[in-house]
């Protein structure tokens, strides 16, 4: 080691001396060139005979040669400076070999037939119960042309080569406790979720309440829930009108209560909306309108199904008891 250090020291000294000599030669050439150019400029200002002109041409040729030589010297300096600092190496500490037979024999390397690149994937194999060591994930590496390497990073901080061999310990910092939990909702998100719940709650009465609370309704507030209606079975019939009044409609097997009406585009007659009042909570509806082509006919459209029979009217509203009989006085 001492011999190598001395040789390397002598080599560095030789390099520095060579660089200094090349730089000095370049500077001397530049100084000579400047003097030659100054003499040439002085001779050009004063008129000279023919022999003097030949001397000036010779001086120009000498200037070109000096310039080329100076440039070559500086190029040599640059190349020597570029070579310094390279091709150096250090010897690392000698690693003590293990006496175990498993460590002396290297694990076989499986070669892949072609270069197949696999994307990086994260596989969360364990449930995150304690936000700490139980949260495990594996990272799949990119397989090269000669060998494939699979590194798995487990939650306890050990890095293995994926083939069941020895593993080198790598302690990883535990993740923060808030990384696996849900972030707190902002006020806007909370208001939005509350609005969704309100829409879901009052969707069932959207059809009836929108009409009753609208322009022709009796209530003052309008429901702000979704206007989407459920798919209902519709049945349309045509019956003759019993009078010219809009409120007079033909009777059927059920009792109906009017809860709203609205005008029809292109028709002078409005459309009336009725709900079944035979039994409380019955979803059956109907709307009645006059036929624009024949005002003496009514178009009745039924929606929904009754949840009772026509005889339920008497059960929901029992008849009043008969008045007591008057007994004759004796």
From Swiss-Prot:
Record's keyword annotation contains Transcription regulation: yes
Key words, A-Z: DNA-binding, Nucleus, Transcription, Transcription regulation
Biased composition (Pro residues): 318-330
Expression tissues: Highly expressed in aleurone cells. In seeds, predominantly present in the plumule, radicle and scutellum of the embryo.
Disulfide partners: none
Induction, as annotated: Induced by abscisic acid (ABA) in aleurone cells. Accumulates in response to uniconazole, a gibberellic acid (GA) biosynthesis inhibitor. Repressed by GA.
InterPro entries documented for this protein: WRKY_dom, WRKY_dom_sf, WRKY_plant, Zn-cluster-dom
Similarity comment: Belongs to the WRKY group II-a family.
Domain notes: The WRKY domain is required to bind DNA.
Protein name as catalogued: WRKY transcription factor WRKY51
